[in-house]
Amino acid sequence: MTSERTKNLRELEAALGLLKLSGFQMNRYCTGKQMRKTRLQTCVLNRIFEISRFPSSKTIVDLALLINVHPKSIQKWFQNTRQAIRKKGSTKGALLLAESEEHSAVDIPLPILADIVEIERRTVSKFGLERVFLQDSN
């Protein structure tokens, strides 16, 4: 079990490494037009936001490759979400945000990111929403 998980992790890291070496192909992303995020992408971003309000640059790049969203878009999503919490002025949200602002960027390990994406993919699929994801990603 451990060796299989280690092998899967190495394969995942190798695949992400190759994608990073090749660089982001801008034609993969729709340029000049605003794109709505799919339900899967939004669920994954919300789950990451629960873990860290300030993900590191490495985490953002890894996440961008895993959910097929441009890193700048992910960065702006986190900024907008933090701002929305501040604007609402909810006591709980403001306290959580104030606590996290004291910390610097958090690096979330790749296996955890991959697990979160897989869990959210299963959840979206379980509720019959995978059709929405497939249509939106085309």
Swiss-Prot record:
Subcellular location: Nucleus
PROSITE patterns documented for this protein: HOMEOBOX_1 (PS00027), HOMEOBOX_2 (PS50071)
Keyword field contains Signal: no
SUPFAM superfamilies assigned: Homeodomain-like (SSF46689)
Recorded coiled-coil stretches: none
Pfam family, one: Homeodomain
Signal peptide: none
Keyword Nucleus on entry: yes
Annotated DNA-binding residue span(s): 30-89
Cellular component annotations (GO), alphabetically ordered: nucleus
Subcellular location, principal: nucleus
GO MF assignments: DNA binding; DNA-binding transcription factor activity, RNA polymerase II-specific
Keywords: DNA-binding, Homeobox, Nucleus
Protein name: Homeobox protein HD-11
Organism of origin: Encephalitozoon cuniculi (strain GB-M1)
